[in-house]
Curated annotation (Swiss-Prot):
Protein name per the record: UPF0297 protein lmo1503
Family: Belongs to the UPF0297 family.
PANTHER family for the chain: UPF0297 PROTEIN YRZL
A Pfam family assignment: IreB
Xref: InterPro entries: IreB
NCBIfam families assigned to the protein according to its UniProt record, in alphabetical order: PRK05473.1
Length: 90
C-alpha cells in the first residue's frame, strides 16, 4: 500500500497551551473590536493565510498572535468547538 493512502497521526502532546490560546484570543478579539473590525473574519483570515496583516498592531495584538503557531491555535479552537457541542470525548 502506498504510504500516501495511510492515515497519519498528528499530536502536539502539550495540553498546557490551552490557557495561552484562550488568553491570547480574548486579547486579540478585544483589539479587533476596538478598531472596528469583525474579529471572527480577521482571525479566520490570519489562520488560513498566515498573513499577520489581518491582525492590527493595536494593543500589540499582531505580535501577540504570532507568539503561538497557527496550528496550535487551530487545534485549541477545534477542541473547544467539539467540547461545547458535546462531540467526541467527554
Amino acid at each position: 500500500m502506498d504510504s500516501k493512502d495511510q492515515t497519519m497521526f498528528y499530536n502536539f502532546g502539550d495540553d498546557s497551551i490551552e490557557e495561552d490560546v484562550k488568553k491570547l484570543m480574548k486579547q486579540v478579539y478585544v483589539a479587533l473590536e476596538e478598531k472596528g473590525y469583525n474579529p471572527v473574519n480577521q482571525i479566520v483570515g490570519y489562520l488560513l493565510s498566515g498573513d499577520p496583516a489581518y491582525i492590527p498592531r493595536h494593543k500589540d495584538a499582531r505580535s501577540m498572535i504570532r507568539r503561538l503557531e497557527r496550528d496550535e491555535i487551530i487545534e485549541e479552537l477545534v477542541k473547544a468547538y467539539l467540547k461545547n457541542n458535546e462531540i467526541g470525548e467527554k
